[in-house]
Amino acid sequence: MLTYETWEENDISFSEEDETKGALSVLSWAYKEYENEIVYACSFGVEGMVLLHLINQVNPSAKVVFLDTNVHFQETYELIQKVRERFPSLNIIEKQPKLTLDEQAKLHGNKLWESNPNLCCKIRKILPLEESLANEKAWISGLRREQSETRKHTKFINQDHRFQSIKVCPLIHWTWKEVWRYVYKHSLPYNPLHDIGYPSIGCEKCTLPVGEGGDSRDGRWAGKVKTECGLHYQ
């Protein structure tokens, strides 16, 4: 088994000639390699809808973790329920932070997402994912190279130094148009916020719509240097 500890620059290759540009082959390999020791960390963005559909074909009882920060859009929570109905055998876990919002405010002040967004992300996303990955050998992410400068070198199989794990990224070669084409073709549910200018959807407090021609990550932590929550830093 390929693990963080046994990592070597591997020569594992996947055909990119099918409709999924290698994604289905990558997922088939991942679930064969790690069996029940792999989890998909899903934010329920539009890429997530594609991956859930593909994962359901490969492993209908796969583990899926959603980092419930308690400050997501209501539309996101409603979408999760629709996904549960569409893929009832998937094991969707809504992972909560250890601190409630009130407890966080007492310790760090009100609106931590404004005063110290990095700390807020650490408490409500990074630490919960660390806990979720503690007993796993690998995790799946919906990163695409096209999304941003920080993601353009992502590979199918990555040694993830942040979480000391193997990170599997099946959609690296997909474009934004290809993601939507797949969603429409398979009549997949998706967050209606995408239809009103939100290409990337995170917490309600830190996500704004993006103007025409803007980068897909422009609406995240708008007005701040921050462009990533920290889950994908190496």
Swiss-Prot record:
> Under the cellular component aspect of Gene Ontology, which terms does the record hold?
cytoplasm
- Disulfide-bonded cysteine pairs: these are none
Q: Which reaction does it catalyse?
A: [thioredoxin]-disulfide + sulfite + AMP + 2 H(+) = adenosine 5'-phosphosulfate + [thioredoxin]-dithiol
- Where does this protein reside within or beyond the cell? Cytoplasm
Q: Which residues bind [4Fe-4S] cluster?
A: 120-121, 203, 206
**Alphabetically, which GO biological process terms does the record hold?**
cysteine biosynthetic process; hydrogen sulfide biosynthetic process; sulfate assimilation, phosphoadenylyl sulfate reduction by phosphoadenylyl-sulfate reductase (thioredoxin)
Q: Could you list this entry's UniProt keywords, alphabetically sorted.
A: Cytoplasm, Iron, Iron-sulfur, Metal-binding, Oxidoreductase
User: Domain of life here?
Assistant: Bacteria
**Record InterPro entries:** APS_reductase, PAPS/APS_Rdtase, PAPS_reduct_dom, Rossmann-like_a/b/a_fold
* Any coiled-coil regions, as ranges: none
Keyword Mitochondrion tagged: no
| Free-text cofactor note | Binds 1 [4Fe-4S] cluster per subunit.
Cofactors required:
[4Fe-4S] cluster
Q: Name one GO molecular function term.
A: phosphoadenylyl-sulfate reductase (thioredoxin) activity
Give the active-site positions.
Answer: 229 (nucleophile)
Please give the family membership noted in the entry.
Belongs to the PAPS reductase family. CysH subfamily.
Instruction: Quote the function comment for this protein.
Output: Catalyzes the formation of sulfite from adenosine 5'-phosphosulfate (APS) using thioredoxin as an electron donor.
The protein depicted here goes by the name Adenosine 5'-phosphosulfate reductase
Q: What is the lineage of its organism?
A: Bacteria, Bacillati, Bacillota, Bacilli, Bacillales
Q: Which gene encodes it?
A: cysH
